[in-house]
């Protein structure tokens, strides 16, 4: 589902080190052209240019020439291709019958790591949802929010989506701030 191209030294150089934190930073919809334009216009170096490990990826929807954020996010988070609007689900499961593909946040959680999804979007937006939920349609905010609360992810932080409330968060053992 995803092609990743390292742009700096390999992560293999760090295998013997005790790595405590990993941040998977996504500039949703951003390309190298946006970064270069920013550097040229402002005459600055970007902090992300100093990161020890960097990479890029090209994601493709299975059903459309243009990939939406749900299919792209699923490719990044689960390593599979799906249909546009599908969030962390298999292509041949439009009725949501089968087990879902595991996303990287769930994999880390299951390996006793602290996990979080932080976004400037709504918490149920397509890209953050791909790392924290599974839904047959990206616009099913209620289903996505419930799945996020059931996920046991340590932190979900973003803008209000009109679904999550303090009471709902408390019911699932979360603190709503």
Show the residue positions of the predicted features.
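N-terminal catalytic scaffold of extracellular/periplasmic and nuclease hydrolases
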Residues: 1-176
